Amino acid sequence: MENRWQVMIVWQVDRMKIRTWNSLVKHHMYVSKKAQGWFYRHHYESRHSRVSSEVHIPLGEARLVVRTYWGLHTGEKDWHLGHGVSIEWRLKRYSTQVDPDLADHLIHLHYFDCFSESAIRRAILGQIVRPRCEYQAGHNKVGSLQYLALKALVTPTRAKPPLPSVKKLTEDRWNKPQKTRGHRGSRTLNRH
């Protein structure tokens, strides 16, 4: 029997972001109770030696599995120390990988109070408008002019601590181009 390879997308991340993600998930599972039904699996409960944690998030019949890894091959740069995240959507026996934006949007649809597009219609009809969205990471588009005006009128309050965002977990602060300064501090190099 020959070896068969299975390829999956693993987002390379900083280990401190993984620690922050895990603590936010646990806080909202056990303290604030906003993550009802979420399941956290520790590294010692996994059969795979590279898995450091798993978070199972029910989405109706389906579920989202956010798996963090350690001990992977290091990246091109010295600071890529072999930590990563994979995001998988599962429904019965079917599974596919999703990107962090879609994962945040799916979580937003199923959990957390939202101040959304329907707020415009409710405000025009004179109904009570919920003044905040608890999960801003789930909004990935620019709102309409009426929505932006209503949002400016009703200032949202910030949830402390913030809700766990898959996009925040996977964003890489090192891959942004550095701004270097030329002679006397003028921005002449790497101007994009």
From Swiss-Prot:
Q: Region Interaction with host APOBEC3G: list its residue ranges.
A: 40-44
GO BP: any one term:
viral life cycle
**Signal sequence range:** none
Residue ranges of the region described as Multimerization: 151-164
Give the subcellular location.
Answer: Host cytoplasm; Host cell membrane; Virion
Q: Which UniProt keywords apply?
A: AIDS, Host cell membrane, Host cytoplasm, Host membrane, Host-virus interaction, Membrane, Metal-binding, Phosphoprotein, RNA-binding, Ubl conjugation, Ubl conjugation pathway, Virion, Zinc
Sites of the modification Phosphothreonine?
96, 155, 188
Q: Where is this region: RNA-binding?
A: 75-114
Does the entry feature the keyword RNA-binding, yes or no? yes
State the protein's purpose.
Counteracts the innate antiviral activity of host APOBEC3F and APOBEC3G by promoting their ubiquitination and degradation. Acts as a substrate recognition component of an E3 ubiquitin-protein ligase complex: mechanistically, Vif hijacks a host cullin-5-RING E3 ubiquitin-protein ligase complex (ECS complex) and the transcription coactivator CBFB/CBF-beta to form an active E3 ubiquitin-protein ligase complex that targets APOBEC3G and APOBEC3F for polyubiquitination, leading to their degradation by the proteasome.
Report the protein name in the record.
Virion infectivity factor
**Taxonomy of the source species:** Viruses, Riboviria, Pararnavirae, Artverviricota, Revtraviricetes
